[in-house]
Amino acid sequence: MQPPSLLLLVLGLLAAPAAALVRIPLHKFTSVRRTMTELGGPVEDLIAKGPISKYAQGAPAVTGGPIPEMLRNYMDAQYYGEIGIGTPPQCFTVVFDTGSSNLWVPSIHCKLLDIACWIHHKYNSGKSSTYVKNGTSFDIHYGSGSLSGYLSQDTVSVPCKSALSGLAGIKVERQTFGEATKQPGITFIAAKFDGILGMAYPRISVNNVLPVFDNLMQQKLVEKNIFSFYLNRDPNAQPGGELMLGGTDSKYYKGPLSYLNVTRKAYWQVHMEQVDVGSSLTLCKGGCEAIVDTGTSLIVGPVDEVRELQKAIGAVPLIQGEYMIPCEKVSTLPDVTLKLGGKLYKLSSEDYTLKVSQGGKTICLSGFMGMDIPPPGGPLWILGDVFIGCYYTVFDRDQNRVGLAQATRL
């Protein structure tokens, strides 16, 4: 006969829900900025107040106080995946964004004049058996306007319909999220995604809503409280990458992971020692702070420093806030090397230039953009998809650190 303590342990393990390892395929689409540029749209109007506004302040004020401009306009977001909300799941395409902390999707009750709502999937609480009314209003400020609506609670499925896709999935119960009834400007009309799933820390969550990954952690749905991103740099590859919840996949990276401690638990913020452009220019002298952000496609830094960087790589400004590099010169340009945790992370000219179509022609754009982020949130560098595409990135909530390793070219 088994000892009672061992029997209880076995029964406990059988009764406990199995911690999952969840893979979410990511798909790469043309960004809003590129879509508007190719159509000849007024992109400069969208970026007049800065291409990114979510870093304007360090954290939102308490409920009832003024909420700062926490989220950017997502003009440069490119990688999206699918989740489900409700029972049965209603599917939505979302940006998995490590630079914000809230989940929101369009609501079936959106305003009549909200054109973006017409052309995206909408959440219908009346079709969900697990919906719980909340009703608290929420308001997220953007450079181009204000996204608003009200909070609701329901089950979130990741991915949306895992049984049909053959993927392992999890259900995060009792998740509070935003039903957007008003979306600002024209940004979301051109967007290929329905909503945003924020994966940063609770500190920057609007209305102090518990983020999806924190709720997932509390419900012990994954073995390790980590998630990792692989972004495929091949523009024609599908899927465009993979988000893994609960672990890492060594097929996506070479060598060991090197870890950086999070310096401030709001965004995924780390210390960066310096940035070298070839052997002729050093930026971030004496060290600086950087955000690792899956929701931004570019690498962003202080305006004056990035202006020097653009000059050093021969990039010239375009009216839409982008910089162009002559494609024939790309192979001759210097490496840009970021020093993080005492290790060097090199970006070749092929890594930091983006080939895009404009007016039927291929042009090359710089993967860097200048923006000054004021205190208390800034100054900051933002390491977006240009960097993450080169370095497989692990976000570790158990030990509050970010892991990096050279990404595999598949």
Curated annotation (Swiss-Prot):
Instruction: Enumerate the CDD domains for this protein.
Output: Cathepsin_D2 (cd05490)
> Where is it found, in Gene Ontology cellular component terms?
endosome lumen; extracellular space; lysosome; melanosome
Q: Please report any disulfide bonds recorded for this protein chain, giving both cysteine positions.
A: C91-C160, C110-C117, C284-C288, C327-C364
Which residues are noted as glycosylation sites?
N134, N261
Q: Which InterPro entries does the record cross-reference, listed alphabetically? A: Aspartic_peptidase_A1 (IPR001461), Aspartic_peptidase_AS (IPR001969), Aspartic_peptidase_N (IPR012848), Cathepsin_D (IPR033144), PEPTIDASE_A1 (IPR033121), Peptidase_aspartic_dom_sf (IPR021109)
From which domain of life does this come?
Eukaryota
- Please report the propeptide residues according to the UniProt annotation: 19-64
Compartments it resides in: Lysosome; Melanosome; Secreted, Extracellular space
Q: Tell me how the protein is altered or processed after translation.
A: N- and O-glycosylated. Undergoes proteolytic cleavage and activation by ADAM30.
What does UniProt give as the signal peptide span? 1-18
GO BP annotations of the record are: autophagosome assembly; insulin catabolic process; insulin receptor recycling; proteolysis
| Major site of localization recorded for this protein | other
Which Gene3D superfamilies is this protein grouped with? Acid Proteases
Q: What binding partners and quaternary form does the record give?
A: Consists of a light chain and a heavy chain. Interacts with ADAM30; this leads to activation of CTSD. Interacts with GRN; stabilizes CTSD; increases its proteolytic activity.
Name by which UniProt lists this protein: Cathepsin D
* Organism, scientific name: Canis lupus familiaris (Dog)
Instruction: Name the gene that codes for it.
Output: CTSD
